[in-house]
A protein has these predicted regions:
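Conserved residues at the C-terminal ends of beta-strands
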Residues: 24, 59-62, 119-122, 156, ...
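N-terminal binding-site loop/beta-alpha segment at the start of enzyme catalytic domains
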Residues: 1-83, 140, 146
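Structural motif corresponding to the early beta-alpha repeats
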Residues: 62, 78-97, 122
């Protein structure tokens, strides 16, 4: 396993050395009723740890609130100093400092730990950060670090480069977390800090954790024309391994998170980071070609984070977007028609959207969800 040493120590004075591959605990395998398949998920976590993964990232809302308790039950069996635990405060659920304190304490109960190695303000944009600061939440969490309950304090961000810079420069953050992959490099998109954001972390020497390196799985399944430049260099490398290597080859990156939901995904990622090879100039050129092709295919930049769920009308928004993106990327109309008509529950289809806007208010990507749902319903119905 490849590790990255940090130049700074944590709040306890301990040296930090994180596995370059981090386990994202948002996409565990699930049972038919939607609950975490705890037997399979625990095996995945134990396999990852045995292979050297030591960074595990969860959050209060993951898996409908069940990720933290499940992770807590698993890590209770491990020596506490053998891993780093990261979780996040959902500021959209905090209207007051007292509400933030209540969630913070509940997280410790769920996780069953005395301290949290990496604590983040979750899914920040400028307005959300400014509100949290005004409520005193940011200052209070620095106090928790001073008290030893948090060892590293940072934030995850879904904002453009200007919003990210506003947040990053405002505090002496121990680290930050950005969505960064070879498709999300252009900071002109509202929710993407992109290359400018990455460069700023280097400039300010703030260690970076990367989330969505495979863009919610999108970059693990490339259409032939997009895969061609990469296959010309290495016909045996998986599409996911290219995406992970691209992210991990940036020198300020300390952890690349991957939400592994199946054994083959974990095995492939462990192989990538067990014998890690930084990207060459030729490989980076091929990645740029692949990205150009993909940008012409994807219908909407949904990562499947499910922050928009549940929909009051029962629409499964990420699943609707997932099948729509498959149509755009792969163009297999027969397969998509079969999936849409025979397998996709009618009660969860986009047609039931009443344009209430609740989803758009919480989408970290700031996607035009309502208009896109209407468009996809028409396209899929007319296959």
């Amino acid at each position: 396993m490849e590790y990255r040493d940090w130049t700074k120590k944590d709040g306890s004075g301990r040296d930090i050395s994180t596995s370059l591959l981090g386990y994202g605990c948002m996409r565990f395998p699930t049972l038919p009723d939607g609950r975490i398949d705890e037997v399979r998920a625990e095996k995945l976590l134990n396999t990852a740890r045995a292979a050297g993964v030591n960074y595990f990232d969860t959050a209060f809302p993951y898996h409908g609130g069940e990720s933290e308790p499940f992770v807590g039950r698993v890590i209770a069996k491990w020596p506490r100093e053998s891993f780093y635990l990261a979780t996040k405060l959902p500021l959209w659920s905090c209207k007051t400092l007292d509400e933030a304190k209540d969630i913070f304490e509940k997280q410790f109960e769920r996780l069953g730990v005395d301290y949290i190695d990496f604590y983040l303000l979750h899914s920040l944009h400028k307005a959300r950060y400014d509100a949290a600061k005004e409520m005193g939440i940011v200052d209070w969490l620095w106090e928790q670090k001073a008290a030893g309950r948090i060892r590293n304090f940072g934030f995850s961000c879904h904002d453009n480069a200007a919003g990210f810079e506003h947040i990053l420069r405002d505090q002496p953050w121990d680290f930050c977390q950005l969505q960064y992959n070879y498709l999300d490099t252009d900071d002109r998109a509202e929710e993407i800090a992109g290359d400018r954001g990455y460069a700023l972390t280097e400039e300010l020497n703030v260690p970076l954790i990367i989330m969505e390196p495979i863009k919610g799985g999108t970059l693990a399944q490339l259409p032939p024309d997009a895969a061609a430049p990469l296959n010309a260099l290495d016909a045996y490398a998986s599409a996911a391994s290219w995406a992970l290597r691209w992210a991990a080859s940036h020198k300020n990156v300390k952890v690349v998170l991957s939400g592994m939901s199946a054994e083959d995904q974990l095995d492939d990622n462990l192989a990538t980071f067990g014998d890690f090879r930084p990207m060459t100039d030729a490989e980076n050129a091929a990645i740029r070609q692949t990205a150009d092709v993909l940008r012409s295919h994807i219908k909407i930049g949904c990562t499947g984070c499910r922050y928009c769920m549940p929909c009051p009308m029962g629409v499964d928004i990420p699943d609707n977007f997932s099948i729509w993106n498959k149509l755009g990327m792969f163009g297999n109309k027969d397969a998509i028609r079969q999936q849409w008509t025979a397998c996709f529950p009618d009660a969860e289809k986009a047609i039931h959207c009443v344009r209430c806007g609740k989803c758009e208010a919480v989408c970290p990507q700031h996607l035009p969800i309502r208009d896109s749902l209407a468009k996809l319903q028409t396209e899929l119905d007319n296959l």
